[in-house]
Amino acid sequence: MNAIPTRKIAALLGLLACSTLVGINPAHASSHMDAPLITLDPAANTTDVYAFVAVNPAGQKVLEVALGVYPFEEPGVGPNKYNFDDNVLYQIIVATGADVAAGNDSITYQFQFTTGYKTQGTILQSYVGVVNADGDSSQNLTQTYTVTKVVGGTSTLLGTGIVPPNNQGVATPHYNVGENGNNPAKPGVTDPTQLDVYTLGAIENLSNGYRSWAGQREDGFYGDVNAIFDLLNLRTGSTNSFDSQSGYNVHMISLEIPVAELGGDQQVVGVYATTSRQQMAVLSSGAGSPAPALTGGWVQVARQGNPLFNEVLVAIKDKDLYGRTKPSSDAALFQQYASTPELASLVNTITFSGMNVAPTTNRTDLVGIFIPDMLRVDLSTGPARLAAGGSNFPAYPDDAGFSNQSVFGGDTLHSAIQAGFGGGAVAGGWPNGRRFGDDVISIAITAVISDLRTNPLTIRSAANIDNVSGNDAVYNKVFPYAGTPFNGRNYLHNPGLGLEPILNFAARGLAGNNAAPLIGGFIVQGDKPVQVLVRATGPSLANYGVTNPIAGTTLSIYSGMTQIATNSGWQSTQKAAIQATGLAPLSPNEAAILITVSPGAYTALVGGSNGASGNALVETFVVTPTP
């Protein structure tokens, strides 16, 4: 089918002929296991690279870039947590001007980390108490970092930063709904002042208008990589969606670069990232367990540009070589894999039952996309449209006009330097850079099964081909954009696989006039509404031996900052319906609300009726999950 009008497709063909322009650069997001050797080195293992145009709080146009490392972080694992490696050199590289087509480095931004402990005379490695601010006395293990700009042989220190704690749970309550370590992680926000204190406190203002952030984030990539590499046997059905990265965290390095620092916005730039280690590490035995002695120059061990290229196009024998080389060598070493992609043959054999749908030879269109392997970003456009909750969390809407299919979903931006698809229209997301939320798997497969050499182009849509329509968390619409890391005490992997959209949830504490409201939070996952019962128990707690129970409760439910329901006596409004659930409160002085809610994050606030104070319990139950 033609996903773009023929007139625009004909114009698009011209873009593909010039590697310095923004063409159809579809790519499959990395499953984070791109090459054999780097899978053995998770702290240096690059996961994804993001790059897009934005405007900073001062109103200046900036290029947002981000590098993910350390794949498949299980939330809450300890006592030795996931951290950046002091012995890894993390680099984000930007190519400008003629360097884009040549694959050369123009500007390199280096991040180097240092780890320290407030005390090593304890088994409590990361936290010795509840952390209320980055680097406080309870954050035992604390990492700091430097940011250095390198141009040619000249290095300039831009500044330093601190890494916030990982989201453990009770030890890091402010990451989570209601500032409660037992609750799920907070959803993304649209205003910087709404960021949790750890994330906000770790945003570093560097020299010359740069900003940086480094720390743990939820893995913003989504897709069924398991099925793709299970001989392309893709899952189908509304209850059979499997997100390979669901419930996992990564470590993210984010840098906000003023466009003026790159030579202005009338250009297309290239972006990629690398990790490196020193040549020699010598291990020692004996007392004191000294750290390895490191010597020699830095050796690149991984790189990331268009994630699809190494993982899906490059043969096993060359995958490690790719990680050790620069984009400037791609034409000589790896062009064959774009020109004659094995993936196209596999798709024809397995997915299309032997029909020659995807072109398999002379793929000059793919060569133009991936050689050299860098993200390309048109800096002349306005800010990219941003994702928030996508289809899984409609209560947190994406920007108007955002499509996770990018240009294939009609999401375009206006370029001042390219004709694009006509009138200066260029892709709104991947392949014009890459935003959080872009469905790069679908875009990638669309490109592979299409023919971008014909005029007009032959476009065959692969939207939602892996049966995963969006992320399992809400992105931030403000720096550093990636979502809040999952809570080690409250998270799920793939809740859509026959599991309830939320788990029954409870929290107990003081409430009423002499205390702050008792706050409970819950997140509805999936893509369909569910009916829940939220109840605020007070006087009946005495039946279970709870001392000082509150005499009466009030209950309010919020979606974001908006109150969507309130009650101060469950028998006053929904008595019959609540009784029918079998979950009615035992006392008429207790509040309860039966409500149908869409996927998203919600907060329940419990107060005291008629001036009462005391212990209360707030609970959320799934009543009728939609099949």
Model-derived regions, located:
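C-terminal segment of classical bacterial N-terminal signal peptides
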Residues: C18-A27
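Surface-exposed extracytoplasmic segments
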Residues: A27-G496
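Generic marker of residues within folded, mature protein domains
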Residues: S19, D41, Y82-F84, Q245, ...
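Bacterial N-terminal signal peptides that target proteins for export
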Residues: N2-L13
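A sequence-level detector for low-complexity, Ser/Thr- and acidic-rich stretches
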Residues: L497-P627
